[in-house]
Structure formats: C-alpha cells, structure tokens
Amino acid sequence: MTSPQALQLIKDPDRLESRLKEIPAEPGVYFMRDSQDQILYIGKSKKLRSRVRSYFRKFNELGPRLELMVRQVAEIEFIVTDTEAEALALEANLIKQHQPHFNVLLKDDKKYPYLCITWSEAYPRIFITRKRRAEAKDDRYYGPYTDTHLLRQTLGLVKRIFPLRQRPKPLFKDRPCLNFDIGRCPGVCQQLIASEDYRKTIHKVAMIFQGRTSELIDTLTPQMEAAAENLNFEQAARIRDQINGLKTLGEEQKVSLPDDTVSRDAIALAADEQHACIQLFQIRAGRLVGRLGFVADAQSGPPGAILQRVLEEHYAGADPVEIPAEILVQTELPEAEMLATYLTEYKGRKVTLLVPQRQSKAELIEMVERNAQYELARTQRFSDRNAEAQKDLAELLDLPELPQRIEGYDISHVQGSDAVASRVVFIDGLPAKQHYRHYKIKNPNVTAGHSDDFASLAEVVQRRFRKFIEHPETDRLSDPDWPDLIMIDGGKGQLSAVVNALSGTGLLEDLQIVSLAKQREEIFLPGESLPLNTDPDQPGVQLLRRLRDEAHRFAVSFHRQQRTERMRRSRLDEIPGLGYERQKQLLAAFRSIDYIREASPEQLATVPLIGPRLAQQIYDYFHP
C-alpha cells in the first residue's frame, strides 16, 4: 500500500530502479498505483520486469495518455502466474473488478445498442438497450451492434418464431393479455409456464445471437420428426414454423466465403489522431450473424495493441461456444500467441489468429476496414460539432483552454425527503458515465418537510473534493479527476453556496464554476450579479444545457429509486420476522409489493429464507 506522501517513481530514480529489480522476469499481472493508493492501470506480460521497465525507459515514446499515467505512478505491484494465458485471464478479471482509469479503452458510445437477456430473472426478458446493468451479473449482453434497424428486425422475427414474454410488466393482474391468446406469449405473467420450461426457450433464442442458428435448426429437426411420428401434429407444425423462420433469418445474413463451415470473426479499425473506430464482423456457417462496433482512444496505443485489447475485452464476457475457430485481424497483434493460447484453453478447441493473405479472407478484412472508415467519418463529424461547442464555451466563459472535463451537479427531493444529488461528467462534450456519481444527502437539517438546496450543494462539493482538501500538496491540475469546468443547476444562490463551501480550501484558484438557471437558460459567474449576455441556442450554451438536463435526469432517477425503496421497506417492515435479508429475497423473486400481495402462501414459501410458516404470515398480512 502506498503512502499518501509517496513520491511519483519518475521523480525518485533510486527507488524506481530498486523497485524494478524486485520484479521477476516471469509471466503475470502488474498494478500501477498513484500516491493515493488508487489503481491507475492493470497490465499483463510474459516477462513482467521487461514490460514494466519499458514504461520508464521509453517514456518519451509512450504517447500523451500513457505519459500522463506514468507521471502519476507511485508504486508498482505484481502477481506472478504459471503461464501467459493465466496472466491474460487474471488481467481481464481484475480490470473488470477495479475499472482503472487508464484501462478504460472503449468509450461509452450510446449509439451502439446491445441485446440483453436477463438471466438474473426467473422468467428472463429479451430487449434492446444502450446501457449495461452492472448490478445484474448473470444477465448476458450481445453486441454492441452497429445496425440498430437490423437488430430490431431480427428481434421482431425471433419474437414471431418463439413464444416469448412480450411485456416487462403484466397488463392485467388476474389473466393473461391477448399475446397469450394468439400464441405469441406462453402466459409468463400468470406463470402458466414453468420457469424451467421457459428458460429452455430462451436458451434457443440465445443460440441465434451466439451465431448458432444452423446448430439450432439441427436440434429442432429431429424434435419435429419425433412429434410427427407420435401423431402430435400441432407440436410438429409449430416446430416446422420455427425452423422455416430460422432459415428465413439465415438467408438474409449470407456472405460469400469459401470453407463456410468454419466459424470466424474479422476485426479491423480506422483511426485519426483522436478516435479509433473498430468493426468486428461475426461469421458463422457462411452467414454474417453480427456486426459489432467499438470506439476507442487512438492515443491508447498502436493499431495492433488497440485491436488486441478490444478482442480481450470482447471475449472476456463471452460463453466458450461463442468464440470462433478463426479470428482474422487487420494487422499483427503484439501478443497474438498469448491471446490464441488463452482462447484455445477457454473454448476447449483450437482458436487461430491470423492476418489473412488469401484473397477471399483478405477481401473480408478490407470490407470490415471500409465499414470502419465510414464509422470514423461519422464520428469525426460528431466530434467536430462537440469541438465547436467546447470552443464556443471557452470563449464565452473566458477559459484559459478548452473545457475537456465538465462536471454538472443537481439536487433532487420532495420537500426535503429522500434528498439526493448527482454528479455527471462530460468528456470532450460526451457523457462519460463511468464517472457519474450519486450522493445521499447526510446533512441532519435536511429532512422531510425541511429542504435546503444550498446546504445540500455545499455538502456535495465538499465530499467531491475531499481528496484535494485533505491533501493540498496533490498536483491537482495533472490529476485526471480534476474538472476544467463545474456547472451547478440553479441560479445565483446555488452558485454562491458552492463557492462559499470551497472558500478557504485553496481550490477556487484552479476551479472554474458557473451555474445555469432553468427559467431563461441564464449563465451566472461567481461574484457577478447579472447573468452573461448569451444566445440560448449558441453551441456553448447548448452544451451546458445538455449537461444540466443530464444531471437533472440522473438526480431525479436516483431520488425515485430511493423513495420507492423506502416505501417498499416501510410496508414489509411491519411484518414480524421479516428482516432485511428476507425482504431482499422476496423483492428479488417478485419484483414489487403488488406481486408479493398477489402471491399464494405456496408461492411465497418457494423463496429462499421464507418457510411455510412465515409465508402464511406474509399472506395473512396482505389478506386480513
């Protein structure tokens, strides 16, 4: 563990050399920590000492992003593994667990949606989303897909082929809706199908998005024939229709390739100085079953290193059956052999990585690269608009440089009850959701019936900058968490509360703070009684408005969540013997108080920690 006073290693050559000598020349994983003991970066190597030493020997060749990281490194730790493949697997798990700032290669790009299957629920849902739920670890995400229209079309066809849950919540309490009557839903809302049987259907659907449509058809065909032999013609016809639907879906995905029995992925990128747009085509049995898109920081490394990291992150969350036998890459990867070994061990079958030379495979990579070029052009146009807004905002507020990291704050409550705050972050004009934060207001004077937005904002900014207040020696301007601009949702009063809260800390000399009032979209500066003379539609003001609206949305959603949770708890708290853990189990199983009220004693008793006696007590409470 590093000392808060520990010097950065680059400023202490003797300690740096001593530390590097302690690192073995074996495979493993290394951690870079700053002076506050925060993990900056996690990496892996087949020779730990050589890899870590390279950061300091080739300091001037690292590029801006890694150079900034190395300047902050105060301690280096490592874990030795037996093999390179073990190092890669351990690195993937640790990055997923800690999410270090300099490991975040892929940008949070909302334009690429995912398809989610909620395996965490007894009756899984299937839906398209642009946000991954971190709290539901059993859920499976496929994507991100570049063609939203095709994804919706595919999901629509899948829902016509298989009887699936159509609604997130039931339309009626005591009977199924029309979807059940016409055969599009098996009656999930009334539990007319067992969870185990429904999950079997979902497994079939998952095979489609895993690129295993042909395998699914091969599985269904003997089932259809067996049903016909047993004179169960209705079931045979239903399976026949499913097979025909799957064949229709497959025909729309064909690509021209030899040896179309081989499953393969093809990956390529196109980059400028800022952005690297990556396309990954998934081809199974000669069909293009998925076209995934990623946007990365072009400064994070050379093309081969970026492609390697994308593949590592992508396959880290995949099922072994989803990993193809062959992966075509645009350029040589720095650790291709290590990645191939890891994927081979994980899949249980040989996985080959290669830069294609044969005409058909080389043409496939060229096609993927062309698509990446189109995505880069779109990203550049969007980036240019954001750059214009940043430049306009810098001129409007007379900032010393373009505001790359902007933070927005808002308070949400109902007359002081369930008071919360939000912090949202825009980087280069785009939401950076990995930096969003919620705050529960702890001020004892803010209670139901007694609201105080000024005191709440003061508390939040003091908590936000606690690290810098307690350690004033920190080089805050080089800290990646230091904002170029802070925007407060409100007027002069809210702005003054924040400024007063930070006065005397020494931070204000390096902080740019403004407020944006809702009524007339007026911008206030500290110490000024009148708002700036601005046009509400100019690019810089529009950027602040987007930030303000996002901070408001994020605060309100958290407030509603807290209020709903409190109301849930207050009802269940009245039932004797129903403690916190049992309440959690009930809510996880039934999702709401209404569903718990409608459940029978037998259904309640199936929940973990709820026996027959307590189940009867719960039922009696709701049915006096």
Swiss-Prot record:
A biological process term (GO) from this entry: nucleotide-excision repair
Key words, A-Z: Cytoplasm, DNA damage, DNA excision, DNA repair, Excision nuclease, SOS response
A Pfam entry, by short name: UvrC_RNaseH_dom
Domain GIY-YIG span(s) in chain numbering: 25-104
A molecular function GO annotation: DNA binding
Subcellular location(s) of the protein: Cytoplasm
Residue stretches making up the UVR domain: 214-249
NCBIfam families from the UniProt entry: PRK00558.1-5, uvrC
Subunit structure: Interacts with UvrB in an incision complex.
The protein, known as: UvrABC system protein C
Naturally occurring in which organism (per UniProt): Cyanothece sp. (strain PCC 7425 / ATCC 29141)
Lineage: Bacteria, Bacillati, Cyanobacteriota, Cyanophyceae, Gomontiellales
